[in-house]
C-alpha cells in the first residue's frame, strides 16, 4: 500500500535527466528537496528539482543534512541553508539529523532552528534517525514538525511498520525503495501521520513571481485565506467534478480576478502552468441585486 497524500524526498541521487517530471508530478502531492550536506557541500541538483516541481505546481519543502561541529557552526549552516533556498519560498524547512557532529546535539540543533526562524523561515521541522532519537534528545517540542523514518522490510510500500522511539511525530518515511511513474530508480516515500497536507505544503507558492502583487486582469492581486475545513479549488467556475485540490482551513491563496458562474462568485487564481484555478467566495445573490 502507498498511503495518500504521497510525499517524496529527493536529492542529487535522483538525477534530473532520469526523471520525467510530468509523469512523476502527476503521482505526488508534495516533495522535500535536499539543499545541502553541511555548509560546504551544496546539492548538485537542488535548483533544478525545485524549479521543475514548482513549474508543475507541486508544493516544495526543503531539507539540509546537519553537520555543525559547534554552536557557531550550526548557526552558520542555518545561514547558508536559508540563503540558498529562500529565493524559492519553500513551504517548510527541515533539519536532517542523522549523525552526531557535536557533543551537544540538542543545543546545537536548537541554535540551528532558532537561526532559521530569526532569518524568516516560517516553519522549521526536524528529521531524526529513529535509532538516534533518544540519544540526541532534541527539543522536538520547539520544532513545527517531526519527521521520522522506519522501513520495516523496506519493500517499497507501507506494510505497517512504525517508528518505535516515540509516538509524537508528524511525518513517517516508510521506505527508501518506492517506485512511481516518471522515475525508474528508488524513491523515499512518506506519509503524513498528524496534521494535514496543507500544514506542511501550503498552496500559495503557485503564483508566479511576475504576477505577484501586480495588477493583472480584473483586480489588483489579493491574498485570501480559507475559513472552512475543506474548500475546493476548481479548474472552472462551476460546481462539479473539476476539483484541482481541496484546501485546508487557514490556507492562503492569491487571486487576481472575480467571475460569476453557476450561481456563485469565484475568485480566480493564476497558476504557473498558465491555467487558472477558481475558488467559491460567495453566492451571486449576495453580490448583486
Where are these regions (language model features)?
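Functionally critical loop-and-helix segments that line ligand-binding/catalytic clefts
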Residues: 1-14, 19-21, 141-215, 258
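Substrate-binding cleft of extracellular glycoside hydrolase catalytic domains
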Residues: 2-113, 117-122
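Residues that flank catalytic or metal-binding motifs in active/ligand-binding sites
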Residues: 4, 91, 142-144, 167, ...
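Glycine-enriched alpha-helix->loop->beta-strand junction motifs that scaffold or abut catalytic
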Residues: 27-30, 56-58, 89, 139-147, ...
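SH3-family beta-barrel domains
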Residues: 208-232, 246-249, 258, 285-289
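SH3/SH3-like beta-barrel superfamily modules
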Residues: 245-286
Amino acid at each position: 500500500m502507498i498511503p495518500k497524500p504521497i510525499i517524496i524526498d529527493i536529492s542529487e541521487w535522483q538525477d534530473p535527466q532520469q526523471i520525467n517530471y510530468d509523469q512523476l508530478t502527476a503521482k505526488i502531492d508534495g516533495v522535500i528537496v535536499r539543499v545541502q550536506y553541511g555548509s560546504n557541500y551544496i546539492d548538485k541538483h537542488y535548483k533544478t528539482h525545485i524549479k521543475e516541481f514548482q513549474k508543475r505546481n507541486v508544493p516544495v519543502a526543503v531539507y539540509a543534512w546537519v553537520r555543525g561541529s559547534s554552536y557557531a557552526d550550526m548557526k552558520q549552516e542555518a545561514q547558508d541553508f536559508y540563503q540558498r533556498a529562500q529565493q524559492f519560498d519553500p513551504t517548510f524547512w527541515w533539519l536532517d539529523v542523522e549523525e552526531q557532529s557535536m557533543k551537544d546535539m540538542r543545543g546545537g540543533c536548537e541554535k540551528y532552528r532558532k537561526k532559521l526562524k530569526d532569518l524568516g523561515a516560517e516553519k522549521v521541522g526536524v528529521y531524526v534517525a529513529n535509532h538516534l532519537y533518544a540519544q540526541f534528545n532534541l527539543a522536538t517540542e520547539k520544532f513545527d514538525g517531526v519527521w521520522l523514518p522506519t522501513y520495516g522490510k523496506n519493500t517499497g510500500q507501507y506494510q505497517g511498520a512504525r517508528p518505535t522511539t516515540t509516538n509524537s511525530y508528524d511525518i513517517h518515511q516508510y521506505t527508501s525503495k518506492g517506485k512511481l511513474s516518471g522515475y525508474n530508480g528508488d524513491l523515499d516515500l512518506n506519509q503524513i501521520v498528524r496534521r494535514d497536507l496543507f500544514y506542511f505544503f501550503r498552496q500559495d507558492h503557485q503564483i508566479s513571481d511576475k504576477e505577484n502583487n501586480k495588477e493583472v486582469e480584473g483586480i489588483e492581486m489579493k491574498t485570501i485565506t480559507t475559513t472552512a475545513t475543506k474548500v475546493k479549488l476548481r479548474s472552472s467556475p462551476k460546481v462539479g467534478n473539476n476539483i484541482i485540490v481541496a484546501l485546508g482551513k487557514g490556507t492562503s491563496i492569491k487571486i487576481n480576478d472575480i467571475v460569476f458562474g453557476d450561481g456563485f462568485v469565484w475568485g480566480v487564481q493564476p497558476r504557473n502552468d498558465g491555467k487558472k484555478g477558481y475558488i467559491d467566495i460567495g453566492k451571486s445573490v449576495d453580490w448583486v441585486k
